[in-house]
UniProtKB/Swiss-Prot annotation:
Coiled coil: none annotated. A lipid is attached at C23 (S-diacylglycerol cysteine). GO terms for cellular component: cell outer membrane. This is Outer membrane lipoprotein omp10 homolog. It is a lipid-anchor. It is found in: Cell outer membrane. Keywords: Cell outer membrane, Lipoprotein, Membrane, Palmitate, Signal. Residues 1-22 form the signal peptide.
Amino acid sequence: MTIARKVLSIGMAGSFAMMLAACTTSGPDAPPMAAAPKGVEGSWIDAKGTGLSTFTAGKFATVATDTGQKLADGSYTMTGATSVEINGTSLIRQTPVSFNCLLISTSQLNCTSSSGQNFVLTRRT
């Protein structure tokens, strides 16, 4: 019977050691990964680098990269998985602006103004 008790004690000690090992950590957690961009949310710069447009929660604003002066603001609506409609006001000209854009990749937005002018915005990270 004493042999059976020893075997049982060793088995219990082994189980207890395994439970303790499961409670320990192997070191600091890895830093959280940045969330992938969702739709057009974020900052975009034009091809010439003169205007920075920021899209957040259905609103957009464009500022001059050299002075920070606000050039335009308004709203945007995702009209499909990769298409967006942008409407607002040019604050310099005090005229309405309207654009349709296609999200070509997570970092490129191809746009056409209501007057037919094409331009490309690149996501700023």
